[in-house]
Structure formats: structure tokens, C-alpha cells
């Protein structure tokens, strides 16, 4: 039976809903779990398959998705924001203050959050290193290019550094901090870094790792484990709805103050271009009055858009990398949506 308001939601967002359903109908993704909300009214769907290789398994409600880079904004950004509110960290602090192994004194915490740090560099045999070796390589084998403060260049290294900075401040791994400071207070009981395989939606089938299920698809997160602030989180549609409402309606149930949440919806770079960045989030602009809407995606096929001013949001969870990550059709369809 439909809840009050669902019919109206279905009518109002019919083109968006049709586009999301087409992802499964056209075989672009094996399955999809999505939700649209407008104030207190929600519309959600779960359809398709969790797995199609080596066997077919129907998608079930409450299955946990590998969120990939949504980990950054759901977990790491709030931890850093809480540290800033507590006076343990400043946006203007140089990265080097907390990570002295990193030898360039110019990039700041704000640069990391907005992907304007210019930090880059190739790490040979990256996926074959141990966690300790990989962390050391990221701290000592990166350099800062000419894009510092001049260009937004999205890079995981920024959030690896933020995770390690939080670890320096609190003496705990970033993933344990996310658990204690964000997930536990918000009662996000279906969100975890260590899901049971049977409850999780599979991602890629790889020659080296076989069917990836219940462990992070991201190779850095797979190696670094609890010390990874850029990926590794698993969650459900229900928990992401809980998080989304909390962020735009109650400042994450009071975990963040008004000023801090304002910064999440404000351009922090003032760099000309198609898209700007707030603290962690990509900014889109409403068609009618150009107010800021926040958005973030994950490589595995996840996507979150939130409009605080209109109290609206969309959560899209797919495993578009199953059975292979070579799936440009999904990226094209997502951009059209």
C-alpha cells in the first residue's frame, strides 16, 4: 500500500524516476536502490539483481552497498568539522603541521577539503604495498603542482591526508573516529566498515581478488583498512536517508553547528568553472534562484544530492562496477540525470 504523498512524488519526479528505472531495464546496472524525498515525503525503489556473475541473486532491501567515495562526505568531513568546532584544527593550518613527513608547507586543511591542494604523484606498484608502505609512500612520494589554489583537481590523496590528520589529533584511526563520532550518535546501525558478505552487494569480479563482496572495492581502502578516510564504508538506503535528513534538517542531530553546516553549502574556492566545491562536497546550483545544492558520487555507482533550502534529496545506490568497472554507459546516464 502506498504511503500518503507517494503518488504525488511519483508524478512530480516521474522523469527522474523513469531515468533511474531505465538503468536496470537497459542493463546498465544489475540493480538499484534509490530514494527521493521532499520534506517528509519519501519515494523509494529497490529493483534488479545484487549479483549477475558468477550467479544471479536478486537485490534485497537492507543490503549494504560499498559507498566508495561517499565515505569522504558521510564520515571524514563530519570528523574534521567536529575537530574544527572543538578548536583542535583550523582550516588555515598547513598540512605539514600534522604530517611533518610531507615536505611542502603550502597546502592547508582547506585545500584538502576542496581538492585544491595540487598534491599528486605516481606511486609504483601501489596495490602491492603493505599498509605501512603505502602510507609512507603517500606522505613522501607526492609533490604539489601548479594547480595549488588555482584549480579543483579531485583526488583521493586529499582525504587520505585528512584521515591521517584526524588520527594524529585523536590517537585513533579515522574509521574508528567515524564510528564513534558520527555513526554511533546518529544511530546509523546499518553502516559499517566490516559488513557481512551475505548482506553486502557485490562489486567487481577481478582476476586477482575474484568476486569482491564485503570488502572495499577501492584498492587503497583494501590495503589501508581502518586508516583510510577516502573509501571503505558500507551502508543501506535507510541509513543514508537517516543521514541525509539529519544533515539538512538538524545539523546532524546537533553534531555540527549552524556555521559549520553553512560552510558545507557555500563555495569555498571561488575558482571559475562548471562546478565549485564546498568543504568536501561538489556544489550544483538550483535552476530557479542559483542557491547551492551539494552532491557527491562514489566510483562503485553511488550518488547523493541534498538541497537544504528546499529540504529535498536523492540517494542512488548501484553496483555499476559489477561484474566489471568498464561501464561508461552508467556515467553517461548519470550525467543526463
Where in the sequence are the language-model features?
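Short, Lys/Arg-enriched N-terminal segments with co-localized hydrophobic residues
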Residues: 1-8
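Short amphipathic alpha-helical segments
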Residues: 13-21
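Active-site SXXK
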Residues: 20-21, 34, 40, 63-91, ...
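A short, well-structured edge-of-sheet supersecondary motif
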Residues: 20-58, 114, 126-130, 280-282, ...
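Conserved hydrophobic residue
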Residues: 29, 89, 253-256
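Short, surface-exposed loop or secondary-structure junction motifs
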Residues: 44, 106-292
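Active-site-proximal loop and beta-strand segments within enzyme catalytic domains
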Residues: 51-156, 325
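Structured C-terminal helix/loop/strand segments within mature extracytoplasmic catalytic/sensor domains
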Residues: 296-337
Amino acid at each position: 500500500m502506498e504511503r500518503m504523498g507517494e503518488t504525488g512524488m511519483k508524478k512530480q519526479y516521474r522523469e527522474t524516476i523513469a531515468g533511474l528505472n531505465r538503468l536496470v531495464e537497459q542493463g546498465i546496472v544489475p540493480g538499484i536502490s534509490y530514494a527521493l524525498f521532499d520534506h517528509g515525503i519519501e519515494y523509494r525503489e529497490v529493483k534488479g539483481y545484487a549479483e549477475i556473475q558468477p550467479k544471479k541473486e536478486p537485490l534485497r532491501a537492507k543490503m549494504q552497498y560499498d559507498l566508495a567515495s561517499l565515505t569522504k562526505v558521510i564520515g571524514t568531513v563530519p570528523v574534521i568539522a567536529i575537530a574544527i568546532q572543538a578548536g583542535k584544527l583550523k582550516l588555515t593550518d598547513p598540512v605539514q603541521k600534522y604530517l611533518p613527513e610531507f615536505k611542502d608547507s603550502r597546502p592547508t586543511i582547506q585545500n584538502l577539503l576542496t581538492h585544491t591542494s595540487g598534491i599528486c604523484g605516481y606511486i609504483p606498484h601501489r596495490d602491492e604495498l603493505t599498509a605501512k608502505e603505502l602510507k609512507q609512500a603517500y606522505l613522501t612520494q607526492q609533490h604539489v603542482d601548479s594547480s595549488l589554489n588555482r584549480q579543483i583537481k579531485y583526488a583521493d590523496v586529499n582525504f587520505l591526508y585528512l584521515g591521517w590528520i584526524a588520527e594524529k589529533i585523536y590517537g585513533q584511526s579515522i574509521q574508528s573516529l567515524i564510528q564513534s563520532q558520527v555513526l554511533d550518535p546518529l544511530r546509523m546501525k546499518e553502516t559499517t566498515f566490516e559488513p557481512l558478505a551475505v548482506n553486502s552487494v557485490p562489486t567487481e569480479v577481478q582476476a586477482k581478488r575474484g568476486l569482491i563482496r564485503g570488502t572495499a572495492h577501492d584498492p587503497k581502502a583494501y590495503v589501508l583498512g581502518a586508516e583510510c578516510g577516502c573509501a571503505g564504508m558500507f551502508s543501506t538506503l535507510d541509513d543514508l536517508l537517516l543521514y541525509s535528513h539529519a544533515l539538512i534538517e538538524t545539523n546532524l542531530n546537533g553534531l555540527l553547528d549552524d556555521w559549520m553546516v553553512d560552510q558545507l553549502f557555500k563555495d569555498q574556492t571561488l575558482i571559475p568553472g562548471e562546478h565549485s566545491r564546498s568543504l568536501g562536497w561538489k556544489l550544483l546550483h538550483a535552476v530557479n534562484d542559483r542557491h547551492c545544492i551539494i552532491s557527491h558520487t562514489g566510483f562503485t555507482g553511488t550518488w547523493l544530492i541534498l538541497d537544504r533550502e528546499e529540504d529535498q534529496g536523492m540517494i542512488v545506490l548501484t553496483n555499476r562496477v559489477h561484474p566489471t568497472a568498464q561501464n561508461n554507459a552508467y556515467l553517461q546516464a548519470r550525467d543526463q540525470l
